[in-house]
Amino acid sequence: ASFPEFDNNIFARGISVKEWNEMRNDFNHPFTNKIINGLYPPGSVIKMGVALSFLDNGIGDNYNVNCSGSLTIGNRNFRCWKSTGHGSVNFRRAIAESCDDFFYKGSLRIGINKISHTLDKLGFGEQTGIDQINEFSGVNPNKEWKEKRYKEPWYVGETVITSIGQGNML
């Protein structure tokens, strides 16, 4: 657990106003319950939901990619965690080895809105409903969400980083 992030025994003896203000204004936010109030990218755990979206949209055992260790889109290079690449990767191997390049390429085939739709069905971007006070909702980004939130278009690179649980996905 991450809460509290300080020795709460200091309050038993009493603390000064100076100590209180230092803790309250601490960059690490020691009074924040990071489990229910922290927003963090999910990382590779999202790949199971993205894999379900792939299956729903025709990407399965018959889909193979060559992972060279990175994918270039425009002037941007999106790296796989395995910099030397995985070589030829099918659906099952991509999941077993968490091949980023497979998820990048699959996400480009089906698009962010289909991925977002599947993740919606799984409850991503919503509160858990476990009755925690002040629980924050995460974000399940898509084209409409970005246009509404930032008044900007969705870029292809955002699709690939979302497929591995990074970017606007909190």
Residue ranges and their predicted role:
Residues 1-44, 49-170:
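Beta-lactam-recognizing serine transpeptidase/beta-lactamase-like catalytic domain environment
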